[in-house]
């Protein structure tokens, strides 16, 4: 009987093999489940091979498949995977032990499974034993393995359905909580939007208040600047007025000085004219003297010859020249005396020119000062008008600002109150959201736990399903083997029937020979004058077949009392019973439907063989032994009744050989066959499909 090892296989490198069976049926796919330890990175170059137990090298594998790489792996948790070995590559059935080995890409063995075999299933492998304690007495039940697997599968399916219902309920709760959270988030978003709008309004009012305050400050600053400018302009006007007065006084003094200088200049001009006249006169005299000197020199040149004559005249002339030289020196001295006067006159003229220029400049400056004063007065008037306008505007702005400030304070109070209410509402919503998030987190953790448990149960169910499929495959293989054996038994049965027909012919031939010998013996006895009733002899002569018994035997029976009494019992020592035909007993009234009731034919053959005697049974079924003889002996009474009447009896019930359940004889034969197939859980489709 095939047994599965549900315990984890020992591993060298941490790889564990799960649900490794002790035996596998050949010509069927083998599914290998294994678990990679945490921290192991699976690779597409890793492979799982089927090795002989004594194999010492990784190259001594019988077959292998590449390992499957999971799409998602979780750090810190083991990784489950499975591979399938195709039926065409599996070893032949035998006593050789094999094992799975996980080999990584470096060629190192990371894990191996317990040993197992490949062999054909035995008939007893289809049954399992269950021990139950009921009322203190131990009961040993033998049931088909398919039934146990079906019950386990039903329980797993029921548990899976319960978990799925629980999962659906949790998902509904999570959906409701999410909808509640979304509603609260929408309300929170609305409150936040209102709060943001109020904040924007508050910021706008604060901004407008700040702008008004800045404008007021700017206007106040401008007013201060204008007042300072007015004061500065007034100071400048006063300073300009003082400067104008000083300039006027200085101008008067300069005018007086200019007048004095003009008079002095006129006086100096008069003196200069006199000096010039004197100079001109002196120059004229000097010119005259020079002309005279030239004339005298000429005369002196003319008179050189007469020098002696005119010595006295020359001396006189020398004196006159000396006198003229003295006069010329005096004139030159007077001219030299006139030079400082010329310089003084020139300085006075320059001073007068500079005074005139200064006076012109002072006039121009005075004119510009007067224009500046006029402009300053106009600007002062305009500034006073602007200051008055600014003061009026400032008063209006102050009044508007006071009104805005009152309205702002009211709005600020209302906004603060609404903000406080919104804050309280937001705090409540935050607390509600935190509580809901905590609830959702708990639900998520619980859902994750249920999902993990469901995944674990699903993996277990898948493993059990694969095990059940494997068991079902083995059952199908066993059923195919049974069908082959049944076909072989049918062939043997046909051969046995053929042999029985031949044996029947032989038995009829032997019976005819014995009957002929008996008839000859009786004729001899009749001839010898044996005493017999005449009526009896006449009846025997008329119908000798009436002496035949309804039952038949192949040999003489020691106990003659078991046979019915005959008319010749007192005179005959040996009774030869004419055997009834075996073929009619086997075929019965429904000979055409013998192929449809094969089990009844086998029972009829066995009962006929047993009723005819142990020697005949040994001749007919030498290879079956005494087991079938004992089973068939239980039907001896019905067989004898059939033999006594000469008509095969139809059984009133059809009985299942496994559970002994009875079916009416007139019921359809398919009902019994379907009932028997139900014990083996045989179906062409998979019984369960897990989604």
Swiss-Prot record:
N-terminal AD (CTNNB1 binding site), as annotated region: 1-190
Residues modified as Phosphoserine: 4
Region annotated Disordered, chain positions: 515-604
Signal sequence, start to end: none
Gene name of the encoded protein: Calcoco1
Species of provenance: Rattus norvegicus
GO MF term set: beta-catenin binding; chromatin binding; RNA polymerase II cis-regulatory region sequence-specific DNA binding; sequence-specific DNA binding; transcription coactivator activity; transcription coregulator activity; zinc ion binding
Function: Functions as a coactivator for aryl hydrocarbon and nuclear receptors (NR). Recruited to promoters through its contact with the N-terminal basic helix-loop-helix-Per-Arnt-Sim (PAS) domain of transcription factors or coactivators, such as NCOA2. During ER-activation acts synergistically in combination with other NCOA2-binding proteins, such as EP300, CREBBP and CARM1. Involved in the transcriptional activation of target genes in the Wnt/CTNNB1 pathway. Functions as a secondary coactivator in LEF1-mediated transcriptional activation via its interaction with CTNNB1. Seems to enhance inorganic pyrophosphatase thus activating phosphogluomutase (PMG). Probably functions as a component of the calphoglin complex, which is involved in linking cellular metabolism (phosphate and glucose metabolism) with other core functions including protein synthesis and degradation, calcium signaling and cell growth.
Subunit structure: Part of a calphoglin complex consisting of CALCOCO1, PPA1 and PGM. Interacts with the bHLH-PAS domains of GRIP1, AHR and ARNT. Interacts with CTNNB1 via both its N- and C-terminal regions. Interacts with EP300. Interacts with CCAR1 (via N-terminus) and GATA1.
Region (Interaction with GATA1): 45-125
Location within or outside the cell: Cytoplasm; Nucleus
Domain topic, free-text comment: The C-terminal activation region (AD) is used for downstream signaling. Seems to be essential for coactivator function with nuclear receptors and with the aryl hydrocarbon receptor. The N-terminal activation region (AD) is necessary and sufficient for synergistic activation of LEF1-mediated transcription by CTNNB1. Contains a EP3000 binding region which is important for synergistic cooperation.
Pfam families documented for this protein: CALCOCO1 (PF07888), SKICH (PF17751), Zn-C2H2_12 (PF18112)
Biological-process GO terms, alphabetical: nuclear receptor-mediated steroid hormone signaling pathway; positive regulation of DNA-templated transcription; positive regulation of gene expression; positive regulation of transcription by RNA polymerase II; signal transduction; Wnt signaling pathway
One GO CC term, this protein: cytoplasm
Zinc finger region(s), UBZ1-type: 653-679
Coiled coil regions, renumbered to chain: 145-205, 232-339, 417-514
Family: Belongs to the CALCOCO family.
Protein name as catalogued: Calcium-binding and coiled-coil domain-containing protein 1
Lineage: Eukaryota, Metazoa, Chordata, Craniata, Vertebrata
